[in-house]
């Protein structure tokens, strides 16, 4: 059985991967633009492959994956919470999702949608060592995702060969839900004084700012403000 040919027939581009989940090709960019040929699929299957990755994005019919990572050891907890909220609010949406479990006990929610984008980090947190990890991220245009039947991967619901399309609104619901698990907000730089806010590096001088402000006030006065 050649999974690469089956994926091709389902309109999904794919790549062979090694045990470290890395592509077993010098380049796979061409597979972001077209499906592999039957001949290429045969080569992939005979390439001493370890597993299979699906190429996300337009080439695969706007395939996108929500990846619940287990780096922080809480993937199952997050996954169960997400599933509960989807089934309680959008059971029809839940039934459309292909769901798989990864070798490191992470989870993938797989779907197609008219609207997708590049990969995004939806929920992050900082661990005890101060390192920032993404608990939930997407695999979109320009990315790939390792899937079943790669060793160690399990199919929980449905088959990726029959992946369904969800609506744009349903995708937004999923994203909002995932964003609610975010525990890390990137700190934005704060200016300690006015002079720092208008530094020479920024291309603004304090004098220039005052001149522009005074010019603006003069204009307002001319118009009886």
Residue ranges and their predicted role:
Residues 1-203:
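Conserved phosphate/metal-binding and DNA-contacting active-site motifs used
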Residues 191-225:
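N-terminal structured subdomain of primase-like DNA metabolism proteins
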């Amino acid at each position: 059985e050649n999974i690469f040919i089956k994926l091709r027939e389902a309109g999904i581009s794919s790549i062979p991967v090694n045990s470290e989940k890395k592509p077993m090709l010098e380049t796979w960019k061409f597979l972001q633009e077209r499906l592999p040929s039957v001949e290429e699929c045969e080569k992939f299957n005979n390439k001493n492959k370890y597993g299979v990755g699906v190429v996300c994005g337009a080439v695969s019919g706007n395939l996108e994956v929500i990846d619940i990572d287990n780096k922080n050891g809480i993937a199952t907890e997050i996954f169960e919470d997400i599933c509960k909220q989807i089934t309680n609010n959008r059971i029809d949406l839940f039934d459309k999702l292909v769901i798989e479990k990864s070798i490191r006990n992470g989870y993938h929610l797989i779907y197609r949608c008219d609207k997708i984008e590049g990969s995004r980090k939806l929920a992050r947190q900082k661990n005890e060592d101060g390192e920032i990890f993404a608990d939930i991220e997407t695999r979109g245009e320009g990315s790939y995702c390792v899937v079943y039947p790669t060793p160690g991967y399990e199919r929980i619901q449905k088959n990726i060969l029959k992946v369904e399309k969800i609506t744009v609104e349903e995708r937004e619901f999923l994203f909002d839900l995932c964003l609610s698990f975010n525990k890390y907000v990137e700190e934005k730089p704060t200016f300690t004084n006015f002079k720092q806010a208008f530094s020479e590096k920024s291309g603004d001088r304090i004098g220039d700012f005052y001149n522009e402000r005074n010019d603006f006030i003069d204009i307002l006065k001319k118009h009886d403000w």
